[in-house]
Amino acid sequence: MKKMFLTGVLALAVAIAMPALAAAPKAPADGLKMDKTKQPVVFNHSTHKAVKCGDCHHPVNGKEDYQKCATAGCHDNMDKKDKSAKGYYHAMHDKGTKFKSCVGCHLETAGADAAKKKELTGCKGSKCHS
């Protein structure tokens, strides 16, 4: 009877833990070079660990599959003037999209702090474009 009870408790614990364990894949190593624009960015997932994966990696065909930004069919148009959802530059720099761009999130993070704003959103000498 005790074995059956313990087996049931263990099975329940595993069933409850599985969604949490499968929720997000392991983030890639730091030093991810995003070089699709004139001024490359070295992106570190560890710096952004407080941000949920889905805040940047939006659903594609109803699924969160955490692809790279410039994956074919996503933000794969490298024309800086392309302001559509396909535009890579636009996806990183737009301030008013449903899914926050890098710049949109950094502006929100900086708030009214002018020095922080320059540090997080400046084109030259920022933490992004060094």
From Swiss-Prot:
CDD domains: Cytochrom_C3. It is found in: Periplasm. The keyword Electron transport applies. GO terms for cellular component: periplasmic space. Keywords: Electron transport, Heme, Iron, Metal-binding, Periplasm, Signal, Sulfate respiration, Transport. One of its GO terms (molecular function) is electron transfer activity. Participates in sulfate respiration coupled with phosphorylation by transferring electrons from the enzyme dehydrogenase to ferredoxin. This is Cytochrome c3. It comes from Nitratidesulfovibrio vulgaris (strain DSM 19637 / Miyazaki F).
